[in-house]
Amino acid sequence: MSDQDALDTQEKELLEMKERVAEMEAEAAKLRAMQEQLDNETEALRNDKESIDAQSVYVGNVDYSVTPEELQSHFASCGSVNRVTILCDKFTGHPKGFAYIEFSEPSLVPNALLLNGSMLHERPLKVTPKRTNVPGMSRGRGRGRGRGRGRGRGGYRGRARGFAPY
């Protein structure tokens, strides 16, 4: 093979590599655009969720036999109720004993908070503003493993000899 042929093949390989790099850069730009669009959508969803949470209340100590209709009629004096959600155990299907009530506007939440302590099915309801769930907060970031281990080193030490005042 002559030097000219070697140069031609190297130039061909170089051109092919440049084409592949250009394709990869175009694909990377497309991926960046898609990621930016996704970020914007999740931000909009997060803002939407926070606005819904601002017009909702948590109702605790709810009797297991209470229906969503009963809760809606109980809170009807506060204003227009959009949604009543009684949470159930996903394995048994039984109610967990609390609910969320979403109102048509955030200004109705203080009226609902006045019903804190009101009786429904002979149980005092606990009514508080709904907190916005922050992902990862309940896990505590890694604490809680190996609880009850910090007892020093070594195994059985036997009965201590000597004076034990207590």
Curated annotation (Swiss-Prot):
GO cellular component, one term: chromatin
Ranges for region Disordered: 129-166
Domain RRM, chain residue ranges per copy: 55-132
Record localization: Nucleus
GO BP annotation list: nuclear mRNA surveillance of meiosis-specific transcripts
Gene3D superfamilies tied to this protein: 3.30.70.330
CDD domains per the UniProt record, alphabetical: RRM_II_PABPs (cd12306)
Protein's name in the database: Polyadenylate-binding protein 2
Keyword RNA-binding part of the UniProt annotation: yes
